[in-house]
A protein has these predicted regions:
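Accessory carbohydrate-recognition regions in carbohydrate-active enzymes
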Residues: 1-279, 283-286
Length: 286
């Protein structure tokens, strides 16, 4: 319930990003919609934990299992053994990555990824890449934007700005433009896809990540991340989100004597009515 809706993004890519196992996972993007019909929309700012070398930009994997609850997602990759847990605030995603002891600890941030890419230029209801930018700001921070057009509404170009911060420092950071990986710490917009590869220390088994999103600026994305999640407690973020859902569910009460099956059906329907809430809110539009 909010502007940020993190999800695994699978191939072939559906509108909501997620597909059942055994489809592969390209990573976890921050902005999604579901139930729209038509061509895919959004699927922006992909983050992917990986455990091998920093010599390629794509690091897809397959799920060993999935656990999905209200406000919480958990999976483990088969090949790398990396566990990913996700929860959110309204405008910021929160991740907890747990790496195997003997694994390299790395993370890719892809500013150019989006759902529904079609090799046919201007294919009906396909999204098309317009531009992207990424900057490594410090040994904890990465920021940038992605600009995409098209999708189910054949819409004009939109820009999603992001700010990503980890609780552990990078010991190495590279960036890419197209498929060219370099030691440069910034890649500016020149109509090619950009991203960053981040390496953590060998003993950093658990790495946490905040990703703030804004449709206005990178500064707003940073503000959203810091104001909504000013700490590093995964459990607190999840509990705060559950509290928000409880407030929504309490808006409509049904007779306590209603059979459990009907209660479940009713509140599931009420939950579904809230899934497409994506308003940036006055704070992000001022």
């Amino acid at each position: 319930y909010g502007m940020v809706k993190p999800s695994p993004d699978c191939t072939p890519s559906p509108n909501s990003g997620w597909l059942p196992m055994p489809e592969r996972v390209d990573g976890f993007a921050q902005v999604h919609v579901s139930g729209t019909g038509g061509g895919p929309k959004y699927g922006n700012v992909l983050v992917t934990p990986f455990g091998d070398g920093m010599d390629r930009v794509n690091h897809y994997d397959y799920r060993k299992y999935e656990t999905i609850r209200l406000g919480y997602y958990d999976t483990q990759f088969k090949q790398s053994g990396i566990r990913t847990e996700i929860t959110t605030s309204n405008r910021a995603s929160f991740y907890r990555f747990t790496y195997p002891e003997d694994s390299l600890k790395s993370l890719a941030v892809d500013a150019g990824f989006f759902l529904g890419e079609n090799p046919v230029p201007d294919a009906r209801e396909a999204q098309q890449f317009v531009g992207s930018e990424i900057q490594v700001l410090s040994d904890h921070e990465v920021a940038g934007y992605t600009r995409i057009r098209g999708g189910w509404n054949n819409g004009k170009a939109y820009t999603v700005y992001f700010y990503a911060e980890t609780d552990r420092p990078f010991v190495q950071s590279l960036t890419w433009k197209g498929n060219r990986i370099t030691e440069a710490q910034s890649q500016y917009d020149s109509a090619e896809k950009t991203g960053a590869l981040l390496r953590f220390a060998k003993n950093d088994k658990v790495v946490q990540l905040k990703v703030g999103i804004s449709f206005l600026s990178m500064q707003k994305a940073k503000f959203n991340a810091h104001s909504e999640i000013p700490h590093w407690s995964f459990e607190k973020v999840h509990q705060d989100l559950l509290g928000q859902w409880e407030q929504l569910f309490q808006k409509i009460e049904i007779d306590p004597s209603t059979p459990l099956a009907k209660k479940r059906m009713f509140y599931t329907g009420l939950y579904h009515t809230c899934l497409l809430y994506t308003s940036p809110s006055p704070r992000d539009c001022s």
